[in-house]
Curated annotation (Swiss-Prot):
Its EC number is 2.4.2.18. 5-phospho-alpha-D-ribose 1-diphosphate binds at residues 93, 96-97, 101, 103-106, 121-129, 133. One of its GO terms (cellular component) is cytosol. Mg(2+) 1 binds at residues 105, 239. This is Anthranilate phosphoribosyltransferase. Belongs to the anthranilate phosphoribosyltransferase family. Binds 2 magnesium ions per monomer. Catalyzes the transfer of the phosphoribosyl group of 5-phosphorylribose-1-pyrophosphate (PRPP) to anthranilate to yield N-(5'-phosphoribosyl)-anthranilate (PRA). It is an enzyme of class 2 (transferase). It comes from Desulfotalea psychrophila (strain LSv54 / DSM 12343). Keywords: Amino-acid biosynthesis, Aromatic amino acid biosynthesis, Glycosyltransferase, Magnesium, Metal-binding, Transferase, Tryptophan biosynthesis. Mg(2+) 2 binds at residues 238-239. Its cofactor is Mg(2+).
Length: 348
């Protein structure tokens, strides 16, 4: 249970003192502390102490919600003209899982976009693998430097756009040095997927710890998203996996439902971890993405079909993940997913 001081003007020194005792901050207290971090008022030592204390205690739902609100407020908004009934999706992982899989969420984004769901793919360079979404997209020929208006137009005109995090979260610069020097997973790994600058209202989010599935699902309910699936794959993967059990927390209709999925449950073969490994370079990773989108059979394609099936469920295009896998397979076999990649590469 969150501990509330009754005032919203807590400073970061007071917040650190609270958190090291094991007490949770309220949403407003967290917002006040994060405002100091994101505005450059907190020192590197204070930032490091604060996020380490949160990590050791375990970030509470109200703390994450408060941090998300501040980070969203500081971000550069990508206005895709989202109406009240429109769906805008993001497929993203926290990173930090150390699994070194290929670029599953990036590849999945093209399949989902080709199925007719608008995708605002939020991403960065490598965190837990040799090659992050930005690295592989750059190797594929996607221009990472497009201005916000052009990115918004990309989503509107071709149904997919890439939101390069460093260009849209300028206030994060104040936390870069402490994060880099600490070298551990912190609340900032969690915040990235929750702070899509285009305001995506449906998400498939992979997390680096199973316990975070229900926590982030509760956060997404508090933030008012339409529907989101938060997933963790057995073997410590921040995505659904065909190498073991996938655990899902489904935030929908005001509640969180948790369940598990085996690859065989959705008509996919179980695979070895080695079969879904990532490339050693961005160029090698780009070849893997192209091969999957072109329909090359194997565990990598099955990984994408599984995650795309879940994403299509979240977006309301299908009633079950099984149906989503079938739809995703049809999209890939039609050539539409590979064509969608070509459209994004060519977009200016």
């Amino acid at each position: 249970m969150a501990v509330t001081l009754g005032k919203n003007n807590m400073n970061i020194r007071q917040a650190i003192a609270r958190v090291v005792t094991g007490a949770d901050l309220s949403e407003s207290e967290m917002m006040a502390s994060m405002e100091e971090v994101m505005s450059g008022q907190a020192s590197p030592a204070q930032i490091a102490s604060f996020i380490t204390a949160l990590r050791m205690k375990g970030e509470a739902v109200e703390e994450i919600v408060g941090a998300v609100r501040v980070m969203r407020d500081k971000a550069t908004f990508i206005d895709c003209g989202l109406g009240p009934d429109d769906i805008l999706m993001d497929i993203v992982g926290t990173g930090g899982d150390g699994a070194d899989t290929f670029n599953v969420s990036t590849t999945t984004s093209f399949v989902v976009a080709a199925a007719g769901v608008a995708v605002a793919k939020h991403g960065n360079r490598a965190v837990s693998s040799r090659c992050g979404s930005a690295d592989v997209l750059e190797a594929l020929g996607v221009d990472l430097s497009l201005d916000p208006a052009t990115v918004a137009r990309s989503v509107q005109e071709i149904g997919i756009g890439f939101l390069f995090a460093p260009l849209l979260h300028a206030a994060m610069k104040h936390a870069i040095v402490p994060r880099r020097e600490m070298g551990i997973r912190t609340i900032f790994n969690i915040l990235g997927p929750l702070t899509n600058p285009a305001g995506a209202n449906v998400q498939l989010i992979g997390v680096f710890e199973r316990s975070l599935t229900t926590v982030l699902a509760e956060v997404l309910l508090r933030l008012g998203e339409r529907r989101s699936l938060v997933v963790w794959g057995e073997g410590n993967m921040d995505e659904m996996t065909v190498t073991g059990t996938s655990y899902i927390a489904d935030a929908h209709d005001g509640r969180v439902t948790s369940y598990a999925v085996e690859p065989e449950d959705v008509g996919l073969a179980r695979a070895a971890v080695a079969d879904i490994s990532g490339g050693r370079t961005p160029e090698e990773s780009a070849q893997q993405v192209r091969a999957v989108l072109a329909g090359e059979k194997g565990a990598r394609l099955d990984m994408v079909l599984l995650n795309a099936g879940a994403a299509l469920l979240a977006a309301g295009r299908v009633e079950t993940i099984v149906e989503g896998v079938v739809m995703a397979r049809d999209v890939v076999e039609s050539g539409a997913a590979l064509k969608k990649l070509g459209q994004l590469v060519a977009f200016r």
